[in-house]
């Protein structure tokens, strides 16, 4: 990464600028987000078998003074490259850039990437296109990010900017001096957790990783911290016993880490932890009580509806029976009257 790069980077104005305009300063640092790097690696895996490298566009943000560039997202750009010429689908690049800028108005064009560490004449042509006026990054220099994706080797990333080279305009169009700039891959706690979950499936046969619950994740984190503390303790003991060479940088780092620890007594920590556990238990008890009351009220309401339906059907049956009895008595009276009339006759 940037700390291991064997060069000294000095910020300076780059390229010819218009009269009366402020000079543009080269970026002092390039920050790469993990999602952008994963997108580049995915593009490399999906390339054709006859392609040595693939290229694409880098999108991100730039600080107000231009000293730091953050690469947040990328998209692939089709190109055909031979030993004699290179063809890049510029129209597709312009349309995709317009769509990305509409979806993410805070991002801007910052440069381009290639999945090869080689810098040649074709790289200079593409670099001049991305750093040109109009659809390029002008007046800011375009960042060229190279990512080596050779199988069986570690992934190496390098960042460059360019300066114009050539006496004539025709010669300068296909020439550029690439200047390396410091860069780093920066990720937060969320990205780190995701990367650790993905890395856990590296040695598994099914190539899948199980996601842990919050309690399991907390337990694993505590175990990792305890392991780090044991390793640091063994190192300090070995330095004290003169079994290992002392490191001033490591000692300063450990001193700064210990200075961040809060000055709290163990008894206070235990008391606060117990109070927190009691609060959690109270909340859990109240939640279970509310759940039980809701279930009980639902059951009572269902029982009332069931009993009300049964009593209504019974009453309607009794009323129907009473109406039937009345109808029977009326029929008997009519029969008796008819028999009396026949006797009189």
From Swiss-Prot:
One record GO biological process: formation of cytoplasmic translation initiation complex
Residue spans of biased composition, Gly residues class: 318-331
Basic and acidic residues biased stretches: 335-345
Signal peptide segment: none
Compartments where located: Cytoplasm
Molecular function GO labels: metallopeptidase activity; translation initiation factor activity; translation initiation factor binding
Gene Ontology CC: eukaryotic 43S preinitiation complex; eukaryotic 48S preinitiation complex; eukaryotic translation initiation factor 3 complex, eIF3e; eukaryotic translation initiation factor 3 complex, eIF3m
Chain segments carrying region Disordered: 308-345
MPN domain boundaries: 30-166
Annotated keywords: Cytoplasm, Initiation factor, Protein biosynthesis
Segments passing through the bilayer: none
Family of the protein in this entry: Belongs to the eIF-3 subunit F family.
Classification via PANTHER family: EUKARYOTIC TRANSLATION INITIATION FACTOR 3 SUBUNIT F, EUKARYOTIC TRANSLATION INITIATION FACTOR 3 SUBUNIT F-RELATED
Known role: Component of the eukaryotic translation initiation factor 3 (eIF-3) complex, which is involved in protein synthesis of a specialized repertoire of mRNAs and, together with other initiation factors, stimulates binding of mRNA and methionyl-tRNAi to the 40S ribosome. The eIF-3 complex specifically targets and initiates translation of a subset of mRNAs involved in cell proliferation.
Assembly and oligomerization: Component of the eukaryotic translation initiation factor 3 (eIF-3) complex.
Protein name as annotated: Eukaryotic translation initiation factor 3 subunit F
Organism: Aspergillus terreus (strain NIH 2624 / FGSC A1156)
